[in-house]
Every structure is written in structure tokens, then in C-alpha cells.
Regions:
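Substrate-binding pocket helix/loop in short-chain dehydrogenase/reductase
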Residues: 94-96, 103-105
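C-terminal helical subdomain
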Residues: 172-174, 178-179, 186, 195-235
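The beta1-alpha1 cofactor-binding region of Rossmann-like NAD(H)/NADP(H)-dependent oxidoreductases
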Residues: 57-68, 101
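Conserved glycine-rich cofactor-binding loop
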Residues: 14-15
Length: 235
């Protein structure tokens, strides 16, 4: 692997932003390691891109699954240069008191515990190597709020704080960044916005801008709340 090629680890690669990023990183010559919950989509993606890329069925809310995945990946590929905690879940549009305990917990588990599980099992090796960038996907709703998405807002505000605290714990050569990807036309957005989601960039359009942006992140970005600079996605 040349010095310019990176090993990129992405959660939530089954569809949406994760899938689009995986395909764009690969197109640019980088090695992608990823996970998702859909066995069908993961198998299809692995067949499509082949080795050295490595995709696995993993539920990031399950710490034991993440631990086993990390053990295998670190042994086979070493620590990633870029770790993208992208997997996410949003509650159905409803007032907070109408959200069941189970639905609330699911949002918390995917959006907050999931990144913590991945960090727990991958970042120690990155710290040992004294290099790497961790990007935890936040949202515009991690810096503002809206009605009927209170659980989602809560998790994204938490991700902002968690990431900035993590940034203070890393050695000077590393970085942890909370990232607002912008507003992108994905299944998640359509569940909130309905038909108006079509007015925003697709995941594939977004990835063409986001991936080069992510590849430029370094130690000087540690702790900085950043936003992908894509036209139309930040309105």
C-alpha cells in the first residue's frame, strides 16, 4: 500500500451514506473495512468489490459482536487510519411522550452505545500506533433541535460531547471529530421529510464531496465540530 492509500473502517455500510462512502473510498484506491446488519447487502457488497476490502455482518449495539469483529480485523489488517462511526437510527416522527421505552432505547443503543463500542475495541490499537482519525457522525440536530425527533436530537448532542471529550484523551498526533454530514436524501431523511427529501443531494452525490473532505482530516482538526461543505445539503 502506498503512503497515500488509507485503511478506512466504516460502520453502517449496508446502505445510505455508509454504502456510498465505501464505494467512493474504494474508487479512489483506499482499502475499506466495514460492517452492517443486513446479511444480504453485506454479502452483495463483498462480492462486488472483492479483496482486500472486508465487510462483515455486525450489530454495533452488541459489544461482544464488535469485540470479535475488531479482533479479526486488527489481526488481518491492523489499526485503521480513518474510523468512521456512521451507523445511525432515527425514531419515527412523534412527540417525546409518544415514544415507547423500547424505541427510545433503540435510538440510544445505535447512535450512542454503538460508536462507544467501536471506539472501545479499535481505538486502543490506533493509540498504540500514535496515528489515526476518528469521525463520529453527528447531525444538524446535534447542534440544534426540532419537534418529533427528541430521542435522535439527544443522541446527536451526546455524540458532540462524547467526541470532544474523546479528543482531549487522545495523543497529539490523533484526532476525534464530530461531523455533521448535512442534509442528504437517504431513507432516514425520507422517514422525516417525506417527499421533500428529494430536494437534497443523494448519498452518492454527497460522497463525491465528503470522501475527499474526510481524507484531509488530521491532528489539527482534533475536537473541532465540522460540517461537510456540500452545496444544498446544509440549507
Amino acid at each position: 500500500m502506498s503512503p497515500n492509500q488509507k485503511t478506512v473502517l466504516i460502520t453502517g455500510v449496508s446502505r445510505g451514506l455508509g454504502r456510498a462512502m465505501a464505494e467512493e473510498f474504494i474508487r479512489l484506491g483506499h482499502t475499506v473495512l466495514g460492517c452492517g446488519r443486513s446479511e444480504k447487502e453485506i454479502r452483495q457488497l463483498q462480492k462486488q468489490v472483492g479483496s482486500p476490502h472486508d465487510f462483515a455482518v455486525v450489530d454495533v449495539t452488541d459489544d461482544e459482536q464488535v469485540a470479535a469483529w475488531a479482533k479479526r480485523i486488527l489481526k488481518s489488517h491492523g489499526a485503521p487510519d480513518l474510523l468512521l462511526n456512521n451507523a445511525g437510527h432515527i425514531n419515527r416522527n412523534a412527540r417525546l411522550w409518544e415514544i415507547s421505552s423500547q424505541e427510545f432505547s433503540q435510538v440510544i443503543d445505535v447512535n450512542l452505545k454503538g460508536p462507544a463500542n467501536v471506539i472501545r475495541h479499535f481505538v486502543p490499537e490506533m493509540v498504540k500506533r500514535q496515528s489515526g482519525v476518528i469521525v463520529n457522525f453527528s447531525s444538524g440536530w446535534g447542534r440544534s433541535t426540532a419537534a418529533e425527533v427528541a430521542p435522535y436530537c439527544a443522541t446527536k448532542w451526546a455524540i458532540e460531547g462524547l467526541t470532544q471529550a474523546l479528543a482531549q484523551e487522545l495523543p497529539p498526533c490523533m484526532a476525534a471529530v464530530p461531523l455533521n454530514p448535512g442534509i442528504i436524501n437517504t431513507d432516514m431523511l425520507r422517514s422525516c421529510f417525506g417527499g421533500s427529501a428529494s430536494g437534497y443531494p443523494t448519498a452518492e452525490e454527497w460522497a463525491k464531496i465528503a470522501v475527499p473532505f474526510l481524507l484531509k482530516l488530521g491532528a489539527l482538526d482534533n475536537g473541532r465540530p465540522l460540517t461537510v461543505p456540500i452545496r444544498g445539503a446544509n440549507d
